[in-house]
């Protein structure tokens, strides 16, 4: 019985030493601001200063008017887009979403292009830009 207690005691001591030495040492804490500034990866002086400006009612109304003008001009610009003249279709061409493997001719749609996947084993004519 004394032998088993002795073995258990040595095992307990061994486990205590093992757990104590297996943990990494605690990191040293930075004690002053100088070491914090030198060790930090982000320098606060790199960022621009922020200026606060008070807005009055006139400036708010002007900005709203400008925003409305921008919105209306964007809408008019999108409505006024001129369609490009399309090139005449050549007889040997590939329709959209059909196979266009490299020896095949070009795609019929001028806005389409041949997109290949799986190491150029599966190719098809695709149209990505709707505004073309």
Curated annotation (Swiss-Prot):
Residues linked to a glycan: 39
Q: Main location per UniProt?
A: secreted
Which Pfam families does the annotation name? Answer: Agouti
Location of this chain's protein in the cell: Secreted
GO MF, one term, reads:
melanocortin receptor binding
Composition-biased stretches, type Basic and acidic residues, lie in: 63-79
Ranges for domain Agouti: 93-132
Which residues constitute the signal peptide according to the record?
Answer: 1-22
Does this UniProt record's set of keywords contain Signal?
yes
What do the Gene Ontology cellular component annotations say? extracellular space
Q: Write out the ranges of the annotated region (Disordered).
A: 61-87
| Alphabetized UniProt keyword annotations | Disulfide bond, Glycoprotein, Knottin, Secreted, Signal
SUPFAM superfamilies membership: Agouti-related protein (SSF57055)
What does the entry give for GO biological process? hormone-mediated signaling pathway; melanin biosynthetic process; melanosome organization
Q: Where on the tree of life does the source sit, at the highest rank? A: Eukaryota
Q: Which cystines does this chain contain?
A: 93-108, 100-114, 107-125, 111-132, 116-123
> What InterPro entries does the entry give?
Agouti, Agouti_dom, Agouti_dom_sf
Function of the protein: Involved in the regulation of melanogenesis. The binding of ASP to MC1R precludes alpha-MSH initiated signaling and thus blocks production of cAMP, leading to a down-regulation of eumelanogenesis (brown/black pigment) and thus increasing synthesis of pheomelanin (yellow/red pigment).
According to the UniProt entry, the note on domains is: The presence of a 'disulfide through disulfide knot' structurally defines this protein as a knottin.
The protein's name is Agouti-signaling protein
Organism listed in the record: Macaca hecki
Lineage, uppermost ranks = Eukaryota, Metazoa, Chordata, Craniata, Vertebrata
Gene name per UniProt: ASIP
